Amino acid sequence: MIRLLRVAVWSLGAALLAGCSGLKTYPDTSPKNLFVKTEASSGSAFARVRVAVHIHQVDANCRAEYLGTVQLNEPSVEIGIPVDRLSFLEFSFFSSSFLGGSSGTIHYTTLLRPRAGHTYDATARYAEGIYHVVIRESDPRQRAGREIERRGLDECGRRA
């Protein structure tokens, strides 16, 4: 009985902490068109790196509304981003050290307006404090794709 009570209290505490973080799971209901490959290495056995992508929809007035987060815990993750609508993607690389007690977050942000019939291949890499994100657009009817130019939220009125 006491063990069951401990498990219930621990589960409730974990749920409360998760709820207090302000992060919610992205409601991934669109057809999968963003394929993210993640490579993250801290370079140390005493440190850890976590990678996530926070997805926002952008309205006609260039205001971003947070929709949710996808944790990039697997080497490859498929996400559905609505087509023909401007989205703001925020890749976050969170590093923490067990011995030094230090931590930090690096962000890579860009606007993306997925086109119908196209796929988007993203690579999110982090190694020894250096991050790199590349997003490529591919049209299955054409051989060559193109790299998506990084654009900030302040550029949302400009079509890419």
Regions found by a protein language model. Name each.
Residues C20-P114, H118-A160:
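Short loop/turn and low-complexity linker motifs enriched in small/turn-promoting residues
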Residues M1-G22:
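Sec-dependent bacterial lipoprotein signal peptides
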